[in-house]
């Protein structure tokens, strides 16, 4: 049994910000402050006992047809490789919790290909908080030099969590954020995909060996060759690694072999 969380936007973001948000909605004439406050204070179940029970009950129906077949001639316009691998009959019409309902009407258990798309399951009820945020006009579009309060708060919470700091302990938080000691986790880079995260980590390592441009100081390990450890496959090669979507990371799993070999031959 999971311990259900039931929270509101106000619980997460604080009364001061919500107060400013409600007043801003009123100023725009979108809704009055009282209506906005009601939305902001609505407590949302993340994973209720009812949903947990349904999730458990559906397990026995995996692989069985539980709904009518959806038939369509629409094949899309993917590349030949994607089209060859595609399985329309297993494609989701909808989903719930740990399951998806295929076009063939069968119930499928969320598997490997969905693991990072649905970490909280399909139709996660906690996302109703996002619906409420949209109704209140909490903006998603922004830029690095105008990161909104929500983004800044989440960065702070991540640093606190990574360092075992209570949210209310502002003194310890300020000390960690100001630290320049090595191996202190006190910075957050906002990225939306796994590929970009891998690329960022890769560049952080390269920056210790090579200058990004002429304005940068000489790196700590200038003149040395960076070495990256990768996961071997069952054939003794490197094709078992994460594929990535950028050229350099793809070379880590044996792709672009001529490019990779040329880099190695030239000491890169």
Task: Enumerate the language-model features and the residues they cover.
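Active-site-adjacent loop/helix segments that line or gate small-molecule/cofactor pockets in enzymes
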Residues: 8-20, 26-101, 108-109, 113-119, ...
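Phosphate/oxyanion-binding active-site loops and adjacent basic polyanion-contact surfaces
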Residues: 146-154, 193-198
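Glycine- and acidic
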Residues: 136-144, 183-188
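PLP-dependent aspartate aminotransferase-fold enzymes
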Residues: 2-23, 31, 92, 103, ...
């Amino acid at each position: 049994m999971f311990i259900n969380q039931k929270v509101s936007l106000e619980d997460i973001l604080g009364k001061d910000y919500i107060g400013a948000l409600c007043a801003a909605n009123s100023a725009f004439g979108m809704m009055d402050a009282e209506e906005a406050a009601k939305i902001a204070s609505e407590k949302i179940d993340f994973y209720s006992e009812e949903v947990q029970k349904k999730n458990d009950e559906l397990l026995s129906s995996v692989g069985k047809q539980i709904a009518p077949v959806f038939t369509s001639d629409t094949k899309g316009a993917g590349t030949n490789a994607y089209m060859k691998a595609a399985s329309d009959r297993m494609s989701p019409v909808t989903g719930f919790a740990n399951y998806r309902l295929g076009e063939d009407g069968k119930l499928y258990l969320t598997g490997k290909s969905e693991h990072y798309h649905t970490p909280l399951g399909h139709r996660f009820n906690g996302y109703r908080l996002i619906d409420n945020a949209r109704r209140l006009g909490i903006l998603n579009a922004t830029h690095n030099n105008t990161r909104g309060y929500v983004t800044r708060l989440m960065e702070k919470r991540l640093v606190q969590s990574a360092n075992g700091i209570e949210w209310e302990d502002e003194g310890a938080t300020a000390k960690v954020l100001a630290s320049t000691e090595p191996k202190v986790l006190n910075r957050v880079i906002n990225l939306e995909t796994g590929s970009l995260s891998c690329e960022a980590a890769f560049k952080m390592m390269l920056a210790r060996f090579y200058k990004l441009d002429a304005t940068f100081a000489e790196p700590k390990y200038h003149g040395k060759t960076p070495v990256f450890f990768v996961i071997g496959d069952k054939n003794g090669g490197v094709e078992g690694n994460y594929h990535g979507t950028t050229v350099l990371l793809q070379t880590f799993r044996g792709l672009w072999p001529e490019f990779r070999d040329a880099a190695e031959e030239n000491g890169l």
